[in-house]
Amino acid sequence: MTLPPLETMMSKNPNLTLTGPDLAALLCSRVCHDVISPVGAINNGLELLDEGGADADAMDLIRTSALNASVRLKFARLAFGASGSVGASIDTGEAERAAKDFAAAEKKTEVTWSGPRAIIAKNRVKLLLNLFLVAYSSIPRGGTIEVTLENPELDAKFKIVAKGKLMRLPPKFVEISTGEVEEAIDAHTIQPYYTVLLADECGMTLGHGATSEELTFTADVIAA
């Protein structure tokens, strides 16, 4: 099935107005939000042990929650953090492993990844992972996500296709990327904001499209 033309955004998006301190604060809030649930579950498991509860159930809860927290922190380190020195490059294989582990921890979405493995600019990897998060949020009941990389070292193109029940283009991502934001950015909307900011920094155009069967998210290098 041929998708309709993707809606795109050009560089220097007028919505990108957050100061550095505000951006850092909101990203920190986002990371804390992502890990507080599994960390809280670990604490619950320890309380069960203290109260003499079923050791097997408590240990299973602790083990599963610790894995979930670890996976989320590793993903956040690549997607939001410095992950090395300023200007460093990152292996796309690390991004693939982080994305697959992230989805596997919740056991509701299958991720396939295709394209050449390469060492590319850090911000491109961060953009790829944040675009993955946008796609992941578009299928809240789970499903499949297909990630395709083309020529990642030069005139890169990233394409992510999401399929699942109750799929929907994330409204805040659409608003921010098309310049139609009506509400202030907060901890719940900072991730799509950061995705658009990364695309701007990388000189890449974002696109999105939808059919009854799938949602498509793209990032392409802007032609000189």
Task: Indicate residue ranges for each PLM-predicted region.
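Conserved signal-transmission helix
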Residues: 2-22
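Conserved short strand/loop->alpha-helix "switch" segment adjacent to the catalytic nucleotide/phosphoryl-transfer site
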Residues: 16-26, 57, 108-136, 140, ...
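Histidine phosphotransfer helical core of two-component systems
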Residues: 20-27, 35-91, 119, 123
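Conserved ATP-binding N-box helix of the HATPase_c
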Residues: 25-54, 123-152, 191-201
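Short beta-to-alpha transition helix within the HATPase_c
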Residues: 85-105
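Glycine-rich/acidic phosphate-handling loop/turn and adjacent ATP-lid/helix
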Residues: 152-192
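Glycine-rich ATP-binding loops of the HATPase_c
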Residues: 203-210
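Glycine-rich nucleotide-binding loop
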Residues: 211-218
